[in-house]
Amino acid sequence: MVLSQTLQTVQDVEGVLTEMVRIGRTCIVSIPNFGYHQLRRMLAETGRAPKSAGVLHYEWYNTPNIRFFTIADFEDFCREKNIRVHRRIALDTEAQAEVLEHPNLNADLAIFVISRA
């Protein structure tokens, strides 16, 4: 099963992920990283909700995004909910490169391979 850049729009994150790992033995989840340094900088410099290409191209009032979480938040969630992370790939989509150092700060997207622990 694959869930691509939609988890931030889901009302019941725990329910969706629990069902995913129950039904599909190994699942792939990609998430936008709202801890990305460019988003942090935009918010700090302008005092306004950040906008960028991808999932943040909406205005604050019409965005489908209801959850703003980071790579670190998702990893903590998986640990707390007994979801095993087999692999994490953190990406800088603008540079089209994998991020190895400080992914919570330097990656705008992450892909996780998960299953029940």
What are the language-model segments listed below?
Residues 10-11, 22-25:
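Helix-to-beta-strand junctions that scaffold the AdoMet/dcAdoMet cofactor pocket
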Residues 1, 44-48, 104-105:
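Short, hinge-like loop/turn segments at secondary-structure boundaries
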Residues 17-20:
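Class I S-adenosylmethionine-dependent transferase superfamily signal
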Residues 75-117:
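A C-terminal cap/extension of S-adenosyl-L-methionine-dependent methyltransferases
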Residues 1-12, 31-32:
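A short SAM/SAH-binding and catalytic strip from SAM-dependent methyltransferases
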